[in-house]
Structures are given as C-alpha cells and as structure tokens.
Amino acid sequence: MNVTTFQFVTWDGGGNLPPALGIAKELHQRGHAVRVIGEESQHAAVSSAGLSFTAWSHPLASGQAERSADERLTYLIKDVWLNTDLADEVCAVLAWQPADAVVVDCMLEGVLARSAEIPASTVVLVHGLFRSVLAMRDSLIAFGNQLRAAVGLPVLETNQLAWEAKDLVVVTTMREFDGVDDEPASNIRYVGPVLPDLDSTAGWPSPWEATDPRPLVLVSLSTMIGQGSSTLAQRVLDVLADNAIRVVMTTGSLSPETLNAPGNAVVFGVIPHEAILPEVAVMVTHGGHGSVMGALAHGVPLVCIPGVAADQPIVGERIEAVGVGRMVAPDAVGELGDTVAQVLSDTSYRTAARHMEALIRRLDGITGGASAVESALDQR
C-alpha cells in the first residue's frame, strides 16, 4: 500500500507550532507519513508527537534573546521570513525524501515565493487571523524592500510574494472572528482553531478554597521572550490587587521570582491554560491568537493588552468587534482594574464568548485542518 507523505515546514515563532503539530498528528493518526522541518528548539515537541524531524542547518528565530526588540524584528524579516535561501534546504530534503504535499508556515514568505520549485502540492498554513497575515505581508514586503535597496539588491514586486499559485491556504481560525468581509477565494479554507488539549483533565495547584466566591481571572502576557516584560507583569498585578478577584498569572519565559504577587494573586511559570480555564471568569491576554482561541473555546470573555507582535492589536480589535471583551492600551494599564470589573459585570461579554465557544467546538480545527490538507492531494 502506498503511503502519502506530508512535509511540514516551520520556524520557532512560539504559538505557530501547536496548530501545525495538531494537524500533523491527526494526519499521522490517519496513516500518513508526516515529517517536519523546523528549528532544533522544536525537536522535542515534534518527536514527542511521534513525528519525524529535520532541523534547519542553523537556528532561525531561536537564540535571539540578546538582541533588542528592533534588532530581533529586523533579523526575523530579513533572515527568516523573507529568506528565499530556506527554499534550497526544503528542496534538498525533498530530493532525499520526496513528499506528496508540503505544508508551509504562512510567515515563511521566502519559501513560499519559490514554491514553484517545490516538487509537491503546496499548502500555506495560517496560524492566526487571515486579515492580520495579509496586513503583515504588505508591511513585510515594504520593509524587506527597504533592506534590499540599502544593500543594492533589486526590490521585490508584490506579486512575487503572492499566494495566488498556492494549491491551498488553511486558516486556523473562525471566519466569524476574523471578520474578513469578502468571500474568500476557493483555495482558502477556514477550519477553526487547532486546540489539541481543549478538554484537558489535568488539575492545577490552586491556593484557594473551592468555596472562595471571588471570580478567578487568568493573566497571560506571552510565552515569547521580549513580550511579557516583568515591568508590565508587575504593573498588572499591582493594578488588579485592588479588585475583589483571585488572579492567576502565568509568566512563560519570565521567572515568577522576579515578581511580587499581592495577596489576591498567585504566579506560575508555565501551567496549562486548559487546566485553569474551566474555572476562569475573565482572561487578561496579550492578544496571541492561540491564547484567545483557548479562552473562547471555554466561553471565557477577555481583556486584551496587545503585545508587540503585529497581529496582536488586530486580535484585540476583533475581541471588541465581536463583543467578547475589551482592549486596554499598554500605556493605560491603570485602567485595567475598571475594565476587568466591567467585563465581569456585563453578561453580554460572557454570552458572546459562549457563542464563539459553540462555533469552535462545532468546527473542530484538528479534524477539519487535517481533512483540508488531505484535499490538496486532489489538486495535483
């Protein structure tokens, strides 16, 4: 029996890996061979999913902690997202181990620009809002052209990085949340968010009695280095200390020991949100798509303090547009306590969040995403 092979191509962007792995694992469970090209920092997660892994010849986004935020962004744009040389590595892997379809992270524009050279069907995996990816592509092309012009390279026309020739674009969100007005092209499939551990039965070490009547607020400002700064995290804890609530903060890459938790709060480094969300009344988020979808999948309304990534302010705007929460500017965190209190008291936010919960659970992005990727084989 012939086995169909899918090659995933990714980079270490934090929240971009779980959707790719969720779909890849489902394809593997359906009997397909699945391989992943990624960064060494992703090796353990990919291998633990039972998938074959090949590392890029050098680190891409990982190992950039010593750079300033501006330096990191410039590096990502030039050496990761717009790096057409990465396509050579993809083609080399495929020459050694052919695949029937290649699933490429939407941010790897340099690889997608040369997809005509890839001897397989090409699937673009959008791990967030399609509208934010389109906005970022325009910015990337403009910024990349500035970099190219500065070193005497010819600029790229927009259509050189277009997706028109791609076989399939899989978007792991809901069209209702994305808010794209135009009817999507026939090769664009909204499959819903990919949430592998949606109904986790894992517990978490709550310091409070089960009978404590105060609402529980989950705060997560990003697992990515350079976003969830200790200054912002401490400011959030201090502001929420005056509210009659219980606060659970997860800090990701920040050490909890760097923060002073007030009496109504507890701080963890990493703890699965799925274990806490069934008890949560409101989530305070940086606007990462995965975190937001995880909360909405449990019917939890949100307060968004947008992070530095380009899509996060757009996610915050969509949170307000669909009525599932409010947005607070990073320089107006002093308003956070009042905003959280408003979202807690106004039941319309919870009602809207529960509507989104029903949509997410009906779509099931894991099975829908895997089926969409399989359909790319029919277009060869």
Q: PLM ranges: what are they?
A:
Residues 1-134, 138, 142-146, 248-303, ...:
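Glycosyltransferase specificity loop/lid
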Residues 178, 182-282:
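Donor-nucleotide binding loops and adjacent catalytic segments primarily
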